[in-house]
Amino acid sequence: MKFFVDTADVKDIRELNDLGLLDGVTTNPSLILKAGRDIVEVTKEICSIVEGPVSAEVTATEYSAMMKEAAALSKIADNICIKLPLTLDGLKACKALTSDGHQTNVTLCFSANQALLAAKAGATFVSPFIGRLDDIAVDGMDLIREIRHIYDNYGYETEILAASVRTVNHVKEAALIGADVVTAPPATLKALVKHPLTDKGLETFLADWAKTGQKIA
């Protein structure tokens, strides 16, 4: 499974990338607002830190305007992945962009039917939103499961990018089902390492080692 971080905070991105665990970054207009920086400036810096795909989202809703914004975003860096909404115009733009060799991430996916269309349009990634479905009492993991089954049925190469991930359990369940990628906030990715027995065991080992009076180096 690939790990993407869902943020436009350069400090968090750099910290996670230095761990060697980061495969890419996803951003959106809300995260750019939170970062409080110019979209081109911050996206360019992110692309210089991370070698993998960096999703930058168009804000236009009509095909020709989407293509114009996509052209501008793609000039920022070679590892830009154009993020598009799952609408008819977004799918049309996806088809055109992938045909031209661009990476694409079709976002705001809430149904298997939508995911099927994204794959037909040649999307590099499709982003089903787990947490937002959970919010309306629909099991978001069921959607990941359905998409995985459909893509496997037909051999689609579109990667399932599990999004709106809020808990470490979301990450585990997505991995068990077979999502190709998970994108999560920095805090959620860092929380994956945590377990009380790990902390307790380390504390015991260190206490016992101190009693030996030895040093390794």
UniProtKB/Swiss-Prot annotation:
List the GO cellular component terms.
cytoplasm
Entries under NCBIfam families matching the protein = fsa_talC_mipB
Q: What is its EC number?
A: 2.2.1.2
Pfam families assigned: TAL_FSA
**What function does this protein fulfil?**
Transaldolase is important for the balance of metabolites in the pentose-phosphate pathway.
Transferase as a keyword of this entry, yes or no, is yes
What keywords does the record list, in alphabetical order? Answer: Cytoplasm, Pentose shunt, Schiff base, Transferase
Tell me its family.
Belongs to the transaldolase family. Type 3B subfamily.
Q: What reaction does this enzyme carry out catalytically?
A: D-sedoheptulose 7-phosphate + D-glyceraldehyde 3-phosphate = D-erythrose 4-phosphate + beta-D-fructose 6-phosphate
Q: Which PANTHER family would you find in this protein's record?
A: FRUCTOSE-6-PHOSPHATE ALDOLASE 1-RELATED (PTHR10683:SF40), TRANSALDOLASE (PTHR10683)
**Location in or out of the cell:** Cytoplasm
Listed transmembrane segments: none
What species is this protein from?
Sinorhizobium medicae (strain WSM419)
Give the Gene Ontology MF terms in alphabetical order.
Answer: aldehyde-lyase activity; transaldolase activity
One GO biological process from the UniProt record? pentose-phosphate shunt
Which EC class heads this enzyme's classification? transferase
Instruction: Please report any disulfide bonds recorded for this protein chain, giving both cysteine positions.
Output: none
Name of this protein: Probable transaldolase
